[in-house]
Regions:
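N-terminal amphipathic/basic leader segments beginning at the initiator methionine
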Residues: 1-39
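Mg2+-dependent prenyl diphosphate-binding active-site environment of isoprenoid biosynthetic enzymes
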Residues: 44-282, 289-302
Length: 306
């Protein structure tokens, strides 16, 4: 069986070495199709302005990395990442939670960003009140979609998603409270694990639960990839290109936010991101060929340019 068939993504065989960009494009196309249907369902309801803003937020592009991690993790453990599977439901719910977090993070009271993925942020395209309601609505839609099945594992996944979302909010609160203060390395790592790491970790663990009913020892993979992702994000904010990223760069430094690169330097931060990735790969090694996509995603987390 080709990898594409195993993933439920109909686009032919994947060449070796693993083409991660092609894999992400296929996952993104598949996820976008489902999100488009969810958004279309909302547009049949009132008020129309809120439904349009939800669609604008959901279909704003992006790598769809978190859904890809869910599906790859599920596949790594022999689960069904197909269109009728629980893994896809969780992947879509997780992406809706992630999207809500971006909409709220961009608000003037938070990060005050005008641009996201090369487009005006929701509060700029609409208004601040609508952006708040979009985030609120996406939270509800996420859990309604996930729980719209009789599968008993959905309850465990809903609890995982709720915990991840709560930790993300706690991380944002820590981040806001830390502006202008000098944090210790342990405090920075705690912030990173919550603000960004929580949903990355939930993606990996959620895929395992969808496949087997339990995390199956993938919690360390989720934690390590969450750490590596946030370090890479902080490095991109320091050294990335605004046009390529589709958003403002240098904002953390300008706001006086504590990041790992600001504490230990760019080179050491890169080394630690690579080390975290290597530790995740070591856990995945015994899973063999079924974990090929998940291993490729782990490497992508630290090598990405956007």
């Amino acid at each position: 069986m080709t990898h594409a068939a195993a993933s439920g993504i109909d686009s032919g065989p994947v060449t070796s070495p693993f083409d991660i960009e092609d894999y992400l494009r296929r996952v993104s196309g598949r996820v976008d199709g489902h999100l488009r249907r969810i958004a279309a369902d909302q547009k049949r309801q009132r008020p129309a302005r809120l439904a349009e803003a939800i669609e604008y937020a959901l279909l704003g592009g992006g790598k769809r990395l978190r859904p890809a991690l869910v599906l790859a993790s599920c596949e790594a453990l022999g689960g069904d990442p197909g269109d009728d599977g629980l893994a896809l439901r969780f992947a879509l719910a997780l992406e809706m939670i992630h999207t809500y977090s971006l909409v709220h993070d961009d608000l003037p009271a938070m990060d005050d960003d005008d641009l996201r993925r090369g487009r005006p942020t929701v509060h700029k395209a609409y208004d601040e009140a609508t952006a708040v309601l979009v985030g609120d609505g996406l939270q509800s839609l996420a859990f309604r979609h996930l729980l719209g099945t009789g599968d008993p594992r959905a309850a465990a996944l809903a609890a995982l998603l709720a915990d991840g979302a709560l930790r993300m909010v706690q991380g944002q609160a820590l981040d806001i409270g830390a502006e202008g203060r000098k944090l210790t390395e342990d405090e920075v790592l705690e912030l990173m694990a919550a603000k960004t790491g929580a949903l990355i970790s939930a993606a990996v663990v959620g895929g395992a639960i969808a496949a087997t009913g339990s995390p199956r020892g993938l919690e360390p993979v989720g934690r390590k990839l969450g750490l590596a992702f946030q370090i890479a994000d902080d490095l991109l904010d320091l050294t990335g290109d605004a046009a390529a990223l589709g958003k403002r760069v240098g904002k953390d430094q300008a706001a006086g936010k504590a990041t790992l690169p600001s504490l230990v330097g760019v080179d050491e931060a890169r080394r630690r991101a690579g080390a975290a990735c290597d530790e995740a790969l070591a856990v995945l090694a015994p899973l063999g060929a079924p974990a090929e996509a998940l291993r490729a995603l782990a490497r992508f987390v630290v090598t990405r340019k956007r």
